Amino acid sequence: MNTINIYTDGSSRGNPGPGGFGVILMWNHHRKEISKGFRLTTNNRMELLAVITGLEAIIKKELPVIVYSDSQYVVKAIEEGWLKKWIATDFKGGKKNKDLWTRYYQLSQNINVKLKWVKGHADNPFNNRCDELATAAADGKHLAIDEWYEENKDK
């Protein structure tokens, strides 16, 4: 059976600061790169938004998906069950990024997705390319607004 592989990375220049993400989708000899930059955000938001963006870009949602991320925050939250606990308690205790986690959770209900951790800044060419995309997006002009973050950062 064919598997869709998604490599992701997020970056921020300062935490918070300008940030961006990079995504590579690969399936059956096809490859697509996606990136976007934001004027004020955090590295964790960009890591998670990269995963969400990759999943949202999938056309063949019936195929199994493996997402490779160098973010332990994202991989552990999903694979070790933290996210299910956060959802069950409505993010009590000040868990951050509720908007993105809720978006991921809703999206993941209709996709057979597994996350795998990869070491960042190492020898994985796809992760390294995602890092290039993310940092270039963060350094770009005309950065988008991470509206939820900017409205809620001081709460």
Model regions: which residues?
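Metal-centered catalytic cores of metalloenzymes
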Residues: 146
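Short beta-strand scaffold segments in enzyme catalytic cores
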Residues: 20-27
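A short, polar/acidic, helix/strand-boundary loop motif
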Residues: 29-46
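Short, glycine/acidic-enriched capping/hinge loops at junctions between secondary-structure elements
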Residues: 17-19, 35
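Extreme N-terminal starter segment of soluble prokaryotic enzymes
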Residues: 1-5
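Short acidic DE-rich linear segments
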Residues: 149-155
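Short, conserved alpha-helix that lines the donor NDP-sugar binding/gating region
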Residues: 47, 51
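RNase H catalytic domain
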Residues: 8-15, 52-129, 133, 138, ...
